[in-house]
Amino acid sequence: MGMRPTARMPKLTRRSRVLILIALGVIALLLAGPRLIDAYVDWLWFGELGYLSVFTTVLVTRFLVFLVAGVLVGGIVFAGLALAYRTRPVFVPNNDNDPVARYRTVVLARLRLFGIGIPAAIGLLAGIVAQSYWVRIQLFLHGGDFGITDPQFGKDLGFYAFELPFYRLLLSYLFVAIFLAFVANVVSHYLFGGIRLTGRSGALSRSARIQLVSLVGVLVLLKTVAYWLNRYELLSHTRGGKPFTGAGYTDINAVLPAKLILMAIAVICAAAVFSAIVLRDLRIPAIGLVLLLLSSLIVGAAWPMIVEQISVKPNAAQKESEYISRSITATRQAYGLTSNVVTYRNYTGDGEATAQQVAADRATTSNIRLLDPTIVSPAFTQFQQGKNFYYFPDQLSIDRYFDRNNNLRDYVVAARELNPDRLIDNQRDWINRHTVYTHGNGFIASPANTVRGIANDPNQNGGYPEFLVNVVGANGTVVSDGPAPLDQPRIYYGPVISNTPADYAIVGKTGADREYDYETSADTKNYTYTGSGGVSVGSWISRTVFAAKFAERNFLFSNVIGSNSKILFNRDPAQRVEAVAPWLTTDSAVYPAIVNKRMVWILDGYTTLDNYPYSQLTSLSSATADSNEVAFNRLLPDKQVSYIRNSVKATVDAYDGTVTLYQQDEQDPVLKAWMQVFPGTVKPKGDISPELAAHLRYPEDLFKVQRMLLAKYHVNDPVTFFSTSDFWDVPLDPNPTASSYQPPYYIVAKNIAKNDNSASYQLISAMNRFKRDYLAAYISASSDPATYGKITVLTIPGQVNGPKLANNAITTDPAVSQDLGVIGRDNQNRIRWGNLLTLPVGQGGLLYVEPVYASPGASDAASSYPRLIRVAMMYNDKIGYGPTVRDALNGLFGPGAGDAATGIQPTEGGAPANVPPNNAPSPEALPGTPPSPPTAVPPAPEASVTLSPARAAAMKEIQSAIGAARDAQKKGDFAAYGAALQRLDDAITKFNNTQ
């Protein structure tokens, strides 16, 4: 029976078609409208920032990739459909029970819809997925050579970095396209009678056989190419159980030959498949495909497994030795740990040191860091917040400046930003939120090696940081008492101000000044932004676009927006850098600095690869996790890398948002490729000014990745490497409140890189022995401009206490625990241990330093402001302890050891300099007493003041309690010492409560 006439499908009425078109238009508008608005806003934003070429390059690249991939995949699928339809049988046997007939009728009635719509939809999806690989394609087009060849095939590493990923992507798309074309061809031939299934048998038309066999043959040929590319990918893969990344003995001697054999078999199978075009016998291609499958199981899987079990495992250390050496060399190259960067020196770690030797280490002992940036933020807030809407981040930053005596010092630094979440009541309405409270004010720095005075001193501010402030003062001029002069302390861009949704500010002259700036004793002074940053919202078109962008009608109706108005948005420094350099991975830390009298945010950018031959594959998230990152939820994305370079230093101006990218690594081939993709966006390294270079620091995340790798890859001998016997461990943070690895610390200390006593700014970390708590090494990375990036590793041979053992020894020392027990008695104060620093001192010795803080109450309440109360130290199992660095050093090494320390002395009389602002109440004085009791608590009244009998009696009791405390201390009687302290507390309370 011939094919029956095609039944006509019912037609839609004109009204129905119009309604459908309207509905489709609305859906398209809802889907595409926000994206079009976002694209237009991005175009404005990139243009204002001076990086419009980045926006257009990415957009054009993605569009072209989308177009090419969509046309390629959709075109191949369309060809499969079209060929099947055009070569369909003229007559198709049919009967009333044929289940295909109804589908055939539907397809024929909507032939264009199915014939064009299906390939178009597949092409659309393929294009959408493909455009996300624009990075891979740009690197293929612009990548160059590394100048290093792989040890197996002798190919330049640029092939693996830039070419191989593209070839793999192209092969994957061709494979998917041919497979989908095969499926489409099979379905079409089945619908139109080219394939007929009757009972247990079937029939193929000549056209169906030729087309399907050809497509299968092409798939087999693509598999042949895949086997060829798989050979190169062996060099960056990890076989289960190997202690290194890359091809091992089994891979080179079994898997690699197997790939070549399978490739040859695949070529033979492809020929067998294509033979069916002429021979008309499908058994031959079927046999070929079965042969390919069996070969892949036997040759590709079983044979390597046999070699692994019989030949390799019994002699693994010797068999893998050559390939471990390859991995050691490649990993050091890929992570910047080669001999021209890393210097190893033997260091005893337990050398004896005299007081004179310790005092001679002036660069170290005068810069011992007492302020822990993860603890002192509440003190910054208490003393320097000023207004409820100003705020400091929970973790502050460390930077260095030269003090007035031209000595290099490290400082805890912070920008006093505006935090929109802390606005209250009518401060939160749209006009105030976005046009009045627009910016922060001030750069705050505290010398990290000192505090205001001893916490138990008569003044109420002992133990708190000394604050050096650059801020807009009460008369509108800039008060520049900070560590460096600053012309503009207003902050419009920063991580805190952008930490809320819709972080935009509308600025510009539209009449009277609107932006809150500062207050005098009489009134509030406002300000108008004059910077170059911001996108104009003066026109009605712009106002409409941003009203849609932020879903805010006030853009259209508010009279505070005028022709000169601009909008500042995307104000997070890291996000701004990531937007203009989408190829960078940014460091989790961003810190403020004063450079050329401007406040800028500085952050580090990395270029990475994940297929560097033989280099260890590393998870950035795992490698950079430490107790700080976990506590503040700042973990990097879980990205796998086998190559990393700190290729870019970026700055973001805190006032106008200007983003500047500087080339840091002039040899990085990946950066060179991106500089060709986006010419002019990255400035050469020579453009880094000396003022900026003085504030660049070795990046923390890179250092953490490198120290984790140095734990293994410091080993030179491959047999020792295989045994893991000489591996190291990153120590856990010994602080009882921590839950991860000990973070590295920025310090100023004697120059490890130059091995002299000059002061150097460096990033340091201790390393433990493998699965033990004894020290194995001490790592220091220099941040000084002259030796920037040089890593020095002091290897420690003996059993020297690691951070955990040192912390245990300090916290369980009887004198320490007794004293802190008195201070924290009855939950009056919460004791907090600061960062445990490991410092080389003397001739081969290591000094552990741990500051001790206390805050009122038993918990971290909002009103609890930690202050430094003690300094604890350990050196060669001996403990030093006191209210100051000088006291602890003298107690540990003898008189004179602390002569070079930056001392803090009890302040005579009242409050010290830099008293807290008027609106900040002074915290309560700590009830505890240092080992050397204060000379007067509270301050003695002036001679002209006559005390009442009750106060005179209280003062007499105070003096008596102090004397008793001194006597108890000399005798070592801690019970009497505690009782004397309680008497002192009671006497002070009585003195304060009487008239």
From Swiss-Prot:
<dbReference type="InterPro" id="IPR005372">
    <property type="entry name" value="UPF0182"/>
</dbReference>
<feature type="transmembrane region" description="Helical">
    <location>
        <begin position="18"/>
        <end position="38"/>
    </location>
</feature>
<feature type="transmembrane region" description="Helical">
    <location>
        <begin position="259"/>
        <end position="279"/>
    </location>
</feature>
<feature type="transmembrane region" description="Helical">
    <location>
        <begin position="287"/>
        <end position="307"/>
    </location>
</feature>
<comment type="similarity">
    <text>Belongs to the UPF0182 family.</text>
</comment>
<protein>
    <recommendedName>
        <fullName>UPF0182 protein MUL_2505</fullName>
    </recommendedName>
</protein>
<feature type="compositionally biased region" description="Pro residues">
    <location>
        <begin position="928"/>
        <end position="941"/>
    </location>
</feature>
<feature type="transmembrane region" description="Helical">
    <location>
        <begin position="113"/>
        <end position="133"/>
    </location>
</feature>
<keyword id="KW-1133">Transmembrane helix</keyword>
<feature type="region of interest" description="Disordered">
    <location>
        <begin position="900"/>
        <end position="947"/>
    </location>
</feature>
<dbReference type="Pfam" id="PF03699">
    <property type="entry name" value="UPF0182"/>
</dbReference>
<feature type="transmembrane region" description="Helical">
    <location>
        <begin position="210"/>
        <end position="230"/>
    </location>
</feature>
<dbReference type="GO" id="GO:0005576">
    <property type="term" value="C:extracellular region"/>
</dbReference>
<dbReference type="GO" id="GO:0005886">
    <property type="term" value="C:plasma membrane"/>
</dbReference>
<feature type="transmembrane region" description="Helical">
    <location>
        <begin position="63"/>
        <end position="83"/>
    </location>
</feature>
<feature type="transmembrane region" description="Helical">
    <location>
        <begin position="175"/>
        <end position="195"/>
    </location>
</feature>
<keyword id="KW-0472">Membrane</keyword>
<keyword id="KW-0812">Transmembrane</keyword>
<keyword id="KW-1003">Cell membrane</keyword>
